[in-house]
């Protein structure tokens, strides 16, 4: 009998059948090409997780707009027709292993840098013809705050001129015509995803990005058709959904990822500031009425990011009540990444009806074979995420230094091309001194099979994790 019967049962999102309930959650890690296409590194990164047994991969936040929509230099894009063919190649490689592919469509809104808004289109055009330009670009990017202070760059965009308290960028309100153009761009990007052979799309309406900024009364203070009342604040996302249906048809699945609680009260703001859970439930129910196929439950914004990123101090499954409450109020499938640390926890949350699909982000950075090991009844072999957030910190630093993110417990993450999964056992009887018998040192001895002389000031190995 399968140890995790519910976790490895089939599931369905819209018209798409999934082989199990394990979903790779979208994460931007800087493995894309500077032209918005997936190169060999990104393809191997995703393919390894597909080989590892997940049922669905939702790709990283993918930009739909080149004017003010780039989030990072090495971010996926589906804003141009030239992005279709490279994306299709990646989709085929993922499909080869039985996993489905959804593409997350994204616009950063106010949570962006003026440097990208002001220079990206020109930089991308120059960089395609003169690769040496990127050395200059990334040197400047490392001093983005100083460049911003010159006042020469255009502001970032949002529903209303409410700056992000973390990014602290000049912010302007989108014009009505610009909003309508963005609706068309989301639809066009979804059509490109469909033409590339992917199985569906996810709209990124969480973590404080543009779609969420329209939904939230904190960031949306407009007085026109796109602001004010609940119906008006819902208009942007509902028009995007309608446009995707128009361009892609009724059978092309759409997931909406939403922050059902922004947690502004936790940083000293009024208790009813922004989106609270009651408002999040209203949003989820309205999205179901609009015909989306699943809700991906998340929380918070850049200003409250601990309630989204969940550092080490947060309790396992602490926000499962958010997904459970949404599931009690909608009839479509619910996905959620609820700080899930083990297959046992995942199975239990499915059995309790907290959610329908288990979204894993960092756990799949730590161990791409998480699903296969769980299915084979070998959960003790899973390399566990320690929630240190090095993946996030290294991604932010790498974004301005032209290098991908990293994982503290898996050196191959985002380096699958350069580091083989099964390194050559080349000890050949040599004696190698390993200074420090911590996790990394001991792991190196085991994997490379040298005759090692370990030096550790403690009297036992692996003293610190």
What are these regions (language model features)?
Residues 1-465:
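Flavin-dependent oxidoreductase catalytic cores
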């Amino acid at each position: 009998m399968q140890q995790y019967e519910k976790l490895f049962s089939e599931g369905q999102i819209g018209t798409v059948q999934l082989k199990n309930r394990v979903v790779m959650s979208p994460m931007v890690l800087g493995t894309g090409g500077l032209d918005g296409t997936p190169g060999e590194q990104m393809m191997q990164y995703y393919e390894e997780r597909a080989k590892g047994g997940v049922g669905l991969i939702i790709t990283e936040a993918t930009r739909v707009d080149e004017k003010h929509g780039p989030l990072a230099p090495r971010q996926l894009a589906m804003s141009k027709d030239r992005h279709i063919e490279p994306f299709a190649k990646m989709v085929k490689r993922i499909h080869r292993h039985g996993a489905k592919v959804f593409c997350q469509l994204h616009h950063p809104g106010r949570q962006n840098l003026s440097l990208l808004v002001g220079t990206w289109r020109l930089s991308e055009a120059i960089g395609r013809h003169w690769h040496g330009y990127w050395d200059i670009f990334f040197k400047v990017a490392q001093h983005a705050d100083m460049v911003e202070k010159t006042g020469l760059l255009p502001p970032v965009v949002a529903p209303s001129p409410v700056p992000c308290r973390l990014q602290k960028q000049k912010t302007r309100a989108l014009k009505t015509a610009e909003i309508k153009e963005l609706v068309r761009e989301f639809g066009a990007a979804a059509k490109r995803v469909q033409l590339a052979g992917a199985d569906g799309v996810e709209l990124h309406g969480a973590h404080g990005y543009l779609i969420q900024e329209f939904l939230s009364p904190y960031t949306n203070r407009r007085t026109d058709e796109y602001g004010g009342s609940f119906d008006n604040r819902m208009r942007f996302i509902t028009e995007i959904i309608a446009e995707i249906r128009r361009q892609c048809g009724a059978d092309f699945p759409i997931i909406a990822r939403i922050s059902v609680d922004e947690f502004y009260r936790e940083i000293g703001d009024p208790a009813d500031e922004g989106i609270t859970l009651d408002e999040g439930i209203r949003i989820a129910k309205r999205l179901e009425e609009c015909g989306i196929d699943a809700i991906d439950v998340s929380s918070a914004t850049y200003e409250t990011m601990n309630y989204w990123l969940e550092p080490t101090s947060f309790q396992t499954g602490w926000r499962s009540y958010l997904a459970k409450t949404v599931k009690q109020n909608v009839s479509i499938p619910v996905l959620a990444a609820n700080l899930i640390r083990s297959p046992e926890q995942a199975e239990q949350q499915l059995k309790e009806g907290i959610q329908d699909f288990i979204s894993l982000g960092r756990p799949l950075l730590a161990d791409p074979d998480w699903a296969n090991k769980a299915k084979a009844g070998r959960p003790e072999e899973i390399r566990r995420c320690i929630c240190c957030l090095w993946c996030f910190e290294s991604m932010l630093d790498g974004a301005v230094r032209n290098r991908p993110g990293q994982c503290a417990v898996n050196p191959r993450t985002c380096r699958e091309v350069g580091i083989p999964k099964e390194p050559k056992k080349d000890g050949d009887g040599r004696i190698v001194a390993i200074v420090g018998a911590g996790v990394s040192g001991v792991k190196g001895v085991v994997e490379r099979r040298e005759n090692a002389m370990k030096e550790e000031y403690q009297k036992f190995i692996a003293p610190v994790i």
